[in-house]
Amino acid sequence: MQPTNFNTLINWQQCSEEQQKALLSRPAINASERITATVSDILDRVKAEGDSALRDFSQRFDHVQVADIRITASEIAAASARLSDDVKHAMAQAVRNIEIFHNAQKMPVVDVETQPGVRCQQITRPIASVGLYIPGGSAPLPSTVLMLGTPARIAGCQRVVLCSPPPIADEILYAAQLCGIQEVFQIGGAQAIAAMAFGSESVPKVHKIFGPGNAYVTEAKRQVSQRLDGAAIDMPAGPSEVLVIADSGATPAFIAADLLSQAEHGPDSQVILLTPDAAIAQAVAVEVEQQLALLSRADIARQALESSRLIVTNDLQQCIDISNAYGPEHLILQIRQPEEIIDQIDNAGSVFMGDWSPESAGDYASGTNHVLPTYGYTSTYSSLGLADFVKRMTVQQLTPQGLLGLASTIETLAQAEQLTAHKNAVTLRVTALNNALTAVNKE
């Protein structure tokens, strides 16, 4: 059962298992062979030719002749001066909340004695250098700068590099300044990912790359993450999505606004409404059409609605089960007492509870991070946080008594795995300790 548009109400119980599976399928995102090959060529050229290739690709893809790849401090200051105070104050408020939430994520040192004389610790260190990719296009995304730059600063990353297609919007440059980012480069697309992964005369190589992008950027991140000479990435990326669970007390206008706020991201976005109330579903369909007519990106949102769903269920529990199976990037619970069911939610990037928690709050300023796993990756990946900008190390320290107390266990396991050198590393020390003890006793 494939609906032709978002006005079609689908009764979940009347669908076969195969139809239900199809209803929860997402728009395909597999990179075409052409994109894969093009990106591979871009990576190789940037690695071999550096800035020359970056300027060539800027001319070819962005239709901009770039003389200086790096944005100067004076250019950032000028951009900041052009911004209105309202925008600056809004960004400052967002940063404050993001700081509070991400500061709370700092991990304490784990320090335990697993048995007498055996001390084990877990400590964290910041990733030394990170690269942030901020898309260009028809609308700037300064909020993504804040979402990436703030935790990078809190984590203590020594070097934070930002790349964005030319010309870079004033809002992005000011957001970078607000986050303390000094190395900003006007390059975009797969070539920007290549520059940060391999380095060039102007752009420093980084250890890990963060940020969203189009199919070419996504494919470039995938490829560099699989190369020994490349860089790690934040998470696999897919089209944006939202799933709303609504009960009979929900407000259709609120639901429609939340669905459309996701649909306007791109034609490959997907939005889903789950409700046991058919009247609510029908009212939402009407609201969507009315609000859609007023949107500046109505054409984009309408395309996204073609692969979206209005699903009527038997009850609220069935909504929860379907949502967990789908694993949405954003999950909105427009139900009474949402806190009573949050423990049943297993797979979601970020959850918005109640009528007064629009997705937009998390996208911009509540404090949570808006970089989230999509495309079903919520079953194994988490929303971006401070942990993504640090790495964990374990430390162990054994006293002589600690080693003696653990020696037979280690030797037995090493012998079972036929790893003689592992066993010898313990046996030699035990022998040395016993010899020393014997010598002391003789004295």
UniProtKB/Swiss-Prot annotation:
UniProt keyword list: Amino-acid biosynthesis, Histidine biosynthesis, Metal-binding, NAD, Oxidoreductase, Zinc
Cross-referenced NCBIfam families: hisD (TIGR00069)
Note on how the cofactor is bound: Binds 1 zinc ion per subunit.
Gene Ontology terms for molecular function: histidinol dehydrogenase activity; NAD binding; zinc ion binding
Subunit comment: Homodimer.
UniProt cross-references to PROSITE patterns, sorted A to Z: HISOL_DEHYDROGENASE
A Pfam family of this chain: Histidinol_dh
PANTHER family, alphabetized: HISTIDINE BIOSYNTHESIS TRIFUNCTIONAL PROTEIN, HISTIDINOL DEHYDROGENASE HDH
Residues annotated as catalytic: 329 (proton acceptor), 330 (proton acceptor)
Name of this protein: Histidinol dehydrogenase
Class of the enzyme per the UniProt entry, highest EC level: oxidoreductase
Organism: Yersinia pseudotuberculosis serotype I (strain IP32953)
Record-linked HAMAP family: HisD
Pathway where this protein functions: Amino-acid biosynthesis; L-histidine biosynthesis; L-histidine from 5-phospho-alpha-D-ribose 1-diphosphate: step 9/9
Known cofactor(s): Zn(2+)
Record's function text: Catalyzes the sequential NAD-dependent oxidations of L-histidinol to L-histidinaldehyde and then to L-histidine.
Residues noted as binding NAD(+) in the record, renumbered to the chain: 133, 191, 214
Domain of life of the source: Bacteria
One GO CC term on file: cytosol
Catalysed reactions, semicolon-separated: L-histidinol + 2 NAD(+) + H2O = L-histidine + 2 NADH + 3 H(+)
EC number annotated for this UniProt entry: 1.1.1.23
Annotated Zn(2+) binding sites: 262, 265, 363, 422
InterPro entries registered for this protein in UniProt: Ald_DH/histidinol_DH, Histidinol_DH_CS, Histidinol_DH_monofunct, Hstdl_DH
GO biological process: L-histidine biosynthetic process
Family: Belongs to the histidinol dehydrogenase family.
Entry binding sites for substrate: 240, 262, 265, 330, 363, 417, 422
